[in-house]
């Protein structure tokens, strides 16, 4: 089980610091990150947080690190911790069957939630 109180500040810092690097009009704006990306980035820097939970992806099932992060973040949309800046979006599933990642992982073809912190 995920300790959200321990994980939440790590996720908030990731969302605060993830900005696009385009050189155009939108340079430096905060980007959306999928729950899967957040899980990978948290695990990369803080592997003890994930514990024995699988990261997620195709065939892993509902009890994964990325699913728990997505659930907790979705509960925080209107909460005070993220100061009303947390935004959720959904990535189209079209074409995802062709995605592959290092280690042979494939994304789940369920809803693909994405999160970012709005600039206010």
Where on the chain are the PLM-derived regions?
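An amphipathic alpha-helix signature
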Residues: 32-43
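Phospho-regulated, low-complexity intrinsically disordered regions of nuclear gene-regulatory
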Residues: 1-29, 36, 48-120
């Amino acid at each position: 089980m995920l300790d959200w109180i321990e994980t939440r500040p790590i996720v908030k810092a990731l969302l605060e610091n993830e900005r696009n690097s385009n050189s155009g009009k939108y340079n430096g704006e905060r980007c959306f990150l999928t729950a899967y990306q957040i899980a990978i980035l948290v695990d990369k820097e803080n592997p003890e947080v994930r514990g024995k939970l699988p990261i997620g992806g195709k065939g892993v099932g509902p009890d994964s690190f990325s699913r728990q992060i997505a659930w907790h973040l979705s509960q925080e949309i209107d909460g005070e911790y993220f100061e009303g800046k947390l935004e959720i979006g959904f990535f189209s599933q079209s074409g995802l069957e062709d995605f592959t990642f290092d280690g042979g992982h494939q994304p789940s073809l369920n809803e693909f939630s994405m999160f970012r912190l709005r600039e206010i």
